[in-house]
C-alpha cells in the first residue's frame, strides 16, 4: 500500500493570506465531554486550536466549564444540560445545538461523551441536521455502531476515526479479525460506507472508496488513552479550514504521528503523554512553514 509523504502533506497547507481573519479558517463545533471525561474534551479542543481552526466552539457539560475555561482561554463554550449521570442529552439542549450546527464549518462529536442511549439520541439528531463535514470519534462511533439506522443516513463528508475495537463493532466482527487483515477490513467497510475511514493503529489506514493510503509516522509511545482525542481534534480542525475530508484525514494522521515522534524524541516512548503531542504541534507546524518558505525562495 502506498504511504503518505511529507511532500504531499506540505501541499495541503498554502501560505496564509495576510488579509485573513478568524472566519477565513472556519468554525469548528466540538460536541464532547461528559462529567466523567473532561480530559477527552480538553485534548481534542486544544488539538483543534493548535491545528489552526479559526474559531472552536465547545458544547460540553456545565460541570466541565470551570475546568476547561480556566485552562483553555481561546475556545467558546456552550454549556450543556445533562442526564442524571452527567451526559449531554439532545432534548435539553436542542435549541442551542441547532443554532451552533448551522454556523459550523465542521463538527466533531464523540470524544468523552459516554456510551449510552443519550449519546445515541444526540448523534441521531446531529446527523439529521448537520450539512458540513462530520467527524465521529470514540463514543460517537460506539453510538453509530449501536444504531444501524444512523449509518443509513451516511454522507460523503463523514469522517470516522475508529481504533481496532471500534472498527470491530462497526463491522460486526472481532478486534482480532480486524487486526489480522487491516487493509481488507478497511476496504470491505468502504464498499458500503461513502465517507472517509481512518483505521487507527500501527500504520494507520486512510480509505475513501477504493482509494487507500497508509501513514508512516508515529510510534508505540502513542498507545495511550487520549491520543485519539488529539487526532480527532486535528482532523476536525483541518476539515473546518476547508480541506476535503480525505485530505483532512491524511494531514491529521501524518502530522499527529509526527508530533508523536517529536514527543518520543523529547520525552521517550515510555514516558510521553498525549498532552505532549500538543506541546510538539508548534514544532510540527513550524517545520511545515519553514519547508514552504524554503521552496518559495
Regions found by a protein language model. Give the residues of each.
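Small-residue (G/A/S/T)-rich helix-start motifs and N-terminal tracts that mark the onset
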Residues: 1-133, 142-159, 164-297
Amino acid at each position: 500500500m502506498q504511504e503518505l509523504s511529507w511532500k504531499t502533506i506540505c501541499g495541503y497547507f498554502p501560505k496564509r493570506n495576510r488579509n485573513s481573519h478568524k472566519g477565513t479558517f472556519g468554525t469548528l463545533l466540538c460536541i464532547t465531554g461528559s462529567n466523567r471525561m473532561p480530559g477527552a474534551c480538553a485534548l481534542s479542543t486544544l488539538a483543534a486550536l493548535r491545528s489552526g481552526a479559526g474559531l472552536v466552539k465547545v458544547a460540553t457539560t456545565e460541570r466541565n466549564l470551570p475546568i476547561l475555561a480556566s485552562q483553555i482561554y481561546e475556545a467558546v463554550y456552550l454549556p450543556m444540560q445533562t442526564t442524571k449521570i452527567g451526559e449531554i442529552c439532545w432534548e435539553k439542549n436542542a435549541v442551542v445545538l441547532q443554532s451552533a450546527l448551522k454556523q459550523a464549518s465542521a463538527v466533531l462529536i464523540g470524544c468523552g461523551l459516554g456510551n449510552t442511549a443519550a449519546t445515541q439520541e444526540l448523534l441521531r439528531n446531529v446527523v439529521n441536521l448537520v450539512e458540513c463535514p462530520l467527524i465521529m470519534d470514540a463514543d460517537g462511533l460506539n453510538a453509530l455502531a449501536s444504531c444501524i439506522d444512523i449509518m443509513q443516513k451516511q454522507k460523503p463528508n463523514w469522517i470516522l476515526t475508529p481504533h481496532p475495537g471500534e472498527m470491530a463493532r462497526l463491522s460486526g466482527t472481532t478486534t482480532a479479525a480486524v487486526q489480522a487483515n487491516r487493509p481488507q477490513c478497511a476496504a470491505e467497510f468502504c464498499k458500503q460506507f461513502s465517507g472517509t475511514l481512518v483505521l487507527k493503529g500501527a500504520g494507520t489506514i486512510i480509505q475513501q472508496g477504493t482509494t487507500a493510503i497508509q501513514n508512516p509516522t508515529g510510534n508505540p509511545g502513542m498507545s495511550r488513552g487520549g491520543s485519539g482525542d488529539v487526532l480527532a481534534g486535528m482532523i476536525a480542525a483541518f476539515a473546518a479550514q476547508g480541506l476535503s475530508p480525505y485530505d483532512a484525514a491524511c494531514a491529521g494522521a501524518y502530522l499527529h504521528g509526527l508530533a508523536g515522534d517529536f514527543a518520543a524524541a523529547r520525552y521517550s516512548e515510555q514516558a510521553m503523554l498525549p498532552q505532549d503531542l500538543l506541546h510538539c504541534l508548534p514544532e510540527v507546524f513550524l517545520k511545515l512553514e519553514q519547508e514552504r518558505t524554503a521552496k518559495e525562495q
